[in-house]
Amino acid sequence: MAHKKGASSTRNGRDSNAQRLGVKRFGGQVVNAGEILVRQRGTHFHPGSGVGRGKDDTLFALDAGAVEFGTHRGRKVVNIVPVA
């Protein structure tokens, strides 16, 4: 039996693609309804007023307005505040 795997064989040489997670719209930015605010795994940020959460924990805007980051009961939340 060979103790080497051969000229072009290797067990390594692959990597997974990046998941492109993170905050997509920052505090103070004006957004329209449906825009993605945060891509995340788990609820690092929780949805506040005017923000929805998708099945993969993505936060998105339900209303148009300005993005606001804050805390509520010790949790980081993302809100949409109407622009006058």
From Swiss-Prot:
Gene3D superfamilies: 2.40.50.100. GO terms for molecular function: structural constituent of ribosome. Residues 7-19 have a biased composition (Polar residues). Keywords: Ribonucleoprotein, Ribosomal protein. PROSITE patterns: RIBOSOMAL_L27 (PS00831). Residues 1-22 are annotated as: Disordered. It comes from the Bacteria. GO terms for biological process: translation. Transmembrane segments: none annotated. GO terms for cellular component: cytosolic large ribosomal subunit. InterPro entries: Ribosomal_bL27 (IPR001684), Ribosomal_bL27_CS (IPR018261). HAMAP family: Ribosomal_bL27. Belongs to the bacterial ribosomal protein bL27 family. This is Large ribosomal subunit protein bL27. The lineage of its organism: Bacteria, Bacillati, Actinomycetota, Actinomycetes, Kitasatosporales.
